Each structure stands twice: as structure tokens, then as C-alpha cells.
Amino acid sequence: MKPGFSAQDKVREGLTAALDRKASAVLVFNLTELTTMADYFVLSTASSERQARAIADAIAEKLGPALSVEGMTHAHWILLDYGDVVFHVFQEEARKFYALERLWGDAANETGIFSGMAPRETRRI
């Protein structure tokens, strides 16, 4: 992990990297009021294993090595844990199955704050 990055810096840089690799359905959830496990979850969707790995690699290239990485082998759901920020890169079927949007639905959606775009509606899965 690159030194001196705040949680917001990690979200911004990781989000930029994911979008540069054409990640879709990107959401940023602020979890600070709900849990101590992380301040932010960043969810994104890839259309293939190859794209999922490319997104995860781009995030790691921007932020440096994660504290923990899970799921690179099959790339259905790749998790990159940066302590206060956790990036989730899903293939579409895995995203539908695990439905983290529902699980963390009480969290503030801050996608627009970080991307400069209006928050995308969470698709009903």
C-alpha cells in the first residue's frame, strides 16, 4: 500500500483505475456508521475473468500491494483489502448471487462524490 493515502484517496485512485479498465456498475459505499471492518466498499462488475483480473491489477498498480487479495484464481469475485477500503471486483453472475448491495443497503452510496458523476441506481438483482 502506498504510504500517505487516506481512505478517500484510496477510493478515488482505485475507482479511477477500475473505470479505466471499463468496470461497470461501480458503487462506493461509506460504511463508517455501520461497521469497523472498513470505511468504504467499492463494488464493480467485469464482463469476464480476464477483465476482472485486469481491473484488480490496475487497482493494485495504483495503490500498491493490498493487505490481502482473494479470488484471483477463478476471478468470479476478487477482493482487494486495503484496510480501510475494500475493493470487490465481480463477474456479473457472482455479483447477482452475493448481492452485497442488499447486504449493505443501509450504507451511504457515495459513488457520485468520488467519481464526479451522479450515483448510479443500484440494479435490482
List where the protein language model places each region.
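Active-site phosphate-binding and catalytic loops of NTP-dependent enzymes
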Residues: 64-71
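P-loop NTPase catalytic core of nucleic-acid-dependent motor ATPases
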Residues: 36
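Short amphipathic alpha-helices in soluble, non-transmembrane regions
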Residues: 55-61
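Long, contiguous binding/interaction regions
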Residues: 1-33, 47-50, 54, 71-77, ...
